[in-house]
Curated annotation (Swiss-Prot):
Its EC number is 6.3.2.1. Pfam families: Pantoate_ligase (PF02569). Beta-alanine binds at Q61. Catalyzes the condensation of pantoate with beta-alanine in an ATP-dependent reaction via a pantoyl-adenylate intermediate. (R)-pantoate binds at Q61, Q153. Pathway: Cofactor biosynthesis; (R)-pantothenate biosynthesis; (R)-pantothenate from (R)-pantoate and beta-alanine: step 1/1. This is Pantothenate synthetase. Keywords: ATP-binding, Cytoplasm, Ligase, Nucleotide-binding, Pantothenate biosynthesis.
């Protein structure tokens, strides 16, 4: 397994692979890898000749009061996981490699970023789309693998790839959970013991909503009320948003008539966690 830090070096390796007509699976990450990332890597390994994982904490997708400086980093642990699951190359550039000069060009995806995290984290998806555009151009992958836990990100990236004619297939992979139901996240490392216990309220509230939907409830306000009521019973939980949106357009819906995304963002103490599920009639 190679660990490469420069665009020049990674392009040389990729040119060789492309000359040999090898398919490339790409897993973009910010590091501090866990079983959720491992599931993406395993899927990429099954479907491609070569697998690349990028590890880059992207500064332009963080807001001024967000956790860029404290975001957990552990390249030794990450490298071990990547090697275990058969990654061929880790691309781990410095910020100065990705952004050697002040950046004036940005990628925006409209409409899909109006709600959910797009509304609550201004500029976040512009940063995500801009850095992924750079990575797609540098790495030229055949397929890219993203987790469904970041459901809005998955939808936004799919639309960007479609609109800009990137010759890349975007593959969404299911949420991976702890045994007690908490969605795997690098930010779970921030939680103390009590917060970790309190964080289970996210999945519990979504389960109650899913039960109501499966019992025939079609009013999105009622579904939202079920989730809010459950979350409000947890003293350490502070709701950022609870949204029921069309799973394709990500626009709010009142009456549930087709496939919907039920998505929540909740602060447990100072840690912001997200979770979701998709429901199809």
């Amino acid at each position: 397994m190679n660990i490469v830090n420069t665009i020049k070096d990674v392009k040389l390796i990729i040119k060789k692979w492309k000359d040999e007509n090898l398919s490339i699976g790409y897993v973009p990450t910010m590091g501090y890898l866990h079983e959720g990332h491992a599931s993406l890597i395993k899927k990429a390994r099954e479907e491609n000749d070569k697998v690349i994982v990028s590890i880059f904490v992207n500064p332009i997708q963080f807001g001024p009061k967000e956790d860029y400086s404290t975001y957990p980093r552990d390249l030794v642990k990450d490298s071990s996981l990547c090697e275990k699951f058969g990654v061929d190359l880790i691309f781990n550039p410095e910020t100065s490699e990705m952004y050697p000069n002040k950046i004036y060009s940005h990628i925006n995806v409209d409409i899909l970023t109006e709600n959910l995290c797009g509304e609550k984290r201004p500029g976040h998806f512009q940063g995500v789309c801009t850095v992924l555009t750079k990575f797609f151009n540098i790495l030229n992958p055949t397929k890219a693998y993203l987790g469904e836990k970041d459901a809005q990100q998955l939808a936004v990236v799919r639309k960007m790839v479609e609109d800009l004619n990137f010759p890349i297939e975007i593959i969404g992979c299911p949420i991976i959970r702890e045994e007690d139901g908490l969605a795997k996240s690098s930010r779970n490392a921030y939680l103390n013991k009590q917060e970790r216990k309190s964080a289970l309220i996210l999945n519990k509230s979504l389960k109650e909503a899913l039960n109501a939907l499966e019992s025939g409830e079609k009013n999105s306000n009622n579904i939202r009320d079920i989730i809010v009521s459950k979350l409000n019973k947890e003293p350490l939980a502070k709701i950022d948003y609870v949204s029921i949106v069309d799973s394709i357009t990500l626009q709010s819906v009142e009456k549930i008539q087709s496939s919907i995304l039920v998505a929540i963002a909740v602060y447990i103490g100072k840690t912001r966690l997200i979770d979701n599920f998709t429901f199809k009639l």
